[in-house]
């Protein structure tokens, strides 16, 4: 991962951006951008980059919480993995978007017209031969309004 590239990238990329690479946009985002640039019929949209994710972790202190949770896992007891996952999910849901990210997200949403949108996850490690995230990430359809968009993100 090129940390400098990520830390110097925008929070939002247009869906047809040439910058929408796997490290910045995840697999789905990068592939949708490629299709859009090739003039396939892809709905308008935008990509929230991995910079937004890393800034969210820093602003909320979640990186430390994740590392602390990982240090306490007992891999011999799968139920602890589920409990840790649920705990971290609650922490992520409770964390507010940093103001810069929220501002750019709001502007991108309004540029689309402020109507109902779909929010799709896009992992930077998905679709790799040695990893599979199929069915493990959420999709939110018919998300209407910035407050709901922020919650879905």
Show the residue positions of the predicted features.
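N-terminal beta-alpha lobe that positions the nucleotide/phosphoryl donor
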Residues: 1-153
